[in-house]
Amino acid sequence: MREAVIVSAVRTPLGGFNGALAGIGATELGGKVIAEAVKRANVPAERVNEVIMGLVLPCGYGQNPAKQAAIKAGLPWQVECFTINKVCGSALKAVMLAAQAVQTGDADVVVAGGMENMSAAPYYLEKARFGYRMGPGQIQDHMVHDGLWDIVNDFHMGISNELCSEKYNISREVQDRYALASYQRALAAIAAGRFKKEILPVAIPQRKGEPKIFDTDECPRETSIEALSKMGAAFQKGGVTTAGNASVISDGAAAVVVMSRQAAEELGCEILATIGAQASYGIDMKYVLVAPIWAVPKVLAKEGLAIDQVDLFEINEAFAGSTCAVMQALELDPEKTNVNGGSVALGHPIGASGCRVLVTLIHEMIRRDSKTGVASLCLGGGEAVALVVKR
């Protein structure tokens, strides 16, 4: 089987809910990171075989959003494209599929990642096609219904955090302190310029004058344990989940270029990382947020590694509580895990986050000269995805 390598890794800064990127559609954001990923890889556009992009909230975008993004990126019409929805794992699964295509010889060059504009997700009227004979009609929120809601158990993902927190005995105080650390780490990373190499600045059109350049993640903010502890429970009375210790609804996109090592060497591309083992795992949907507890050991077993042999982990912070539960169960070193903050502070554009955490992981591995990293995310449906990358 051929070796799959990553030769570029880029993301937009993440915009807050109804924030800086709210007016730029997901396919536009996707087009920007695809174009930049190909440019940074120094790969001719005609050498790209396929584009795979995650998108969880596609309502209103039209046919094959990945193709739209590829065309906006300036790629040729003949490039094959498809859009994947594996909820929060979409963009990492896109990279996993790209690696499989390269490893099996089906492709030499694949652009993979994800894109999401949660701010722009529309509302829709489910029975409008057939009419309402009598009684009230309900307008659905595409973002909540299709992105954040467990249809089987009929509850918001925040309720899963309540259940996981109870099961793993993660207190409100522990969650708030973890959230504070995530914000502090993200702000420190921004101040030190650690995200600059991975971020593609985005020009935001203004009503008058020149576009405004958006180049810094919008969501990280100064806070304190006192401020976090005063926030009310968001999902159930007396609950432990708040707006302060949950991931931030946000907008953004990320992409990587995956190639065969042979093609990368032929074109003189700089190899940023080699793709190792990949894994998925499914559990009881009620406890979806802690599924990485099983996905991470599975991927490490496939790679022949122990937890303590991994230099860096990126575990997506859907909620502080569930992240604490995963770290507790796997005995992860906090100094190796989400070292620049995570989705609690940076934001969680659900269709893009899988690649966002990978992009951040790769750039931090380069900065530290780390040899092995693992990215993992829980995802709606009671599953998690995990990927090993090596340098």
Tell where the protein language model's regions lie, with residue ranges.
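Active-site-proximal alpha-helical scaffold in enzymes
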Residues: I84-E116, S165-R194, A255-Q262, P349-S370, ...
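Conserved active-site "lid/cap" helical segment
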Residues: M1-Y61, P65-A73, W77-E80, S160-R172, ...
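Active-site pocket-lining segment
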Residues: S160-E162, F195-E198, Q206, G276-A345
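Flexible glycine-/small-residue-enriched beta->alpha junction loops
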Residues: V109-L163
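Conserved catalytic cysteine-centered active-site region
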Residues: L55-V109, V152-H156, E222-V248, A329-R356, ...
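Condensing-enzyme catalytic core mediating Claisen C-C bond formation in acyl metabolism
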Residues: M1-A26, I139, S224-V290, W294, ...
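N-terminal extracellular/periplasmic Venus flytrap/periplasmic-binding protein-like
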Residues: R11-T12, G23-K32, R40, V174-E266, ...
